[in-house]
Swiss-Prot record:
Alphabetized UniProt keyword annotations: DNA damage, DNA recombination, DNA repair, Metal-binding, Zinc, Zinc-finger
Annotated Gene3D superfamilies: 3.40.1360.10, 6.10.250.240, RecR Domain 1
Organism of derivation: Methylobacterium nodulans (strain LMG 21967 / CNCM I-2342 / ORS 2060)
CDD domains noted in UniProt: TOPRIM_recR
Official protein name in the record: Recombination protein RecR
GO biological process per UniProt: DNA recombination; DNA repair
Residue span(s) of domain Toprim: 83-178
HAMAP family: RecR
């Protein structure tokens, strides 16, 4: 086990940073050192922003997005098309699509995908609320913006069957989403093209 290079408070900071996606122990040490060097300009404001976020973040009961209000900012936006619902696996996918600027509809976050390997079944996902939202009279289209993985496509097929009795068109993202690809890692142009060229599922 590597020897501690600083007091327990700094070591704890490094350990917590190392848990972040994309940060290993080395990167976490560099990030911690940068935060410490810029304590007033970076560390203190970051700590305050994290404290406030921890206290105020809620999950939107309408769509499953995270925000500091319920309903969330997107659900409260009356300029969005209420007749189209974009279904995503996770909030990170919602954020990725928002960055593309191609979506003017509303979202629905499933909170995962069906996975026999991970034991994720339909009752573990936000599916009953999806059926409720897709059943409203003004709903015309449900866009399945799910990752092009085996589990993502299995979930897409399940949702298509789940909504088959409703008078809504079910579509999926088109060109630009590679097989095995995840939305959060795609650039805005690719996502924008995928939304515009969606096809019936």
């Amino acid at each position: 086990m590597p020897q501690a290079v600083a007091g327990p408070e700094i070591e704890r900071l490094i350990q917590l940073l190392a848990r972040m996606p994309g940060l290993g122990p080395r990167s976490a040490r560099r990030a911690a050192l940068q935060l410490i060097k810029k304590r007033e300009a970076l560390l203190a404001p970051l700590a305050e922003a994290m404290r406030v976020a921890c206290e105020r973040i809620v999950v939107c009961h309408e769509c499953g997005n995270v925000d500091t209000s319920d309903p969330c900012t997107i659900c409260r936006d009356h300029s969005r098309d209420p007749s189209i619902l974009v279904v995503v696996e996770d909030v990170s996918d919602l954020w990725a699509l928002e960055r593309s600027g191609a979506v003017t509809a509303r979202y629905h976050v499933l909170g995962g995908v069906l996975s026999a390997l991970d034991g994720i079944r339909p009752e573990n996902l936000n599916l009953s609320r999806l059926v409720e939202r897709a059943s409203v009279p003004e709903m015309r289209e449900v866009i399945l913006a799910l990752n092009a993985t085996v589990d993502g496509q299995t979930t897409a097929h399940y949702i298509t069957e789940l909504l088959a009795h409703l008078p809504v068109k079910v579509t999926k993202l088109a060109h630009g989403v590679p097989v095995g690809g995840e939305l959060d890692y795609l650039d805005e142009g690719t996502l924008s093209a995928a939304i515009r060229q969606r096809t019936a599922f």
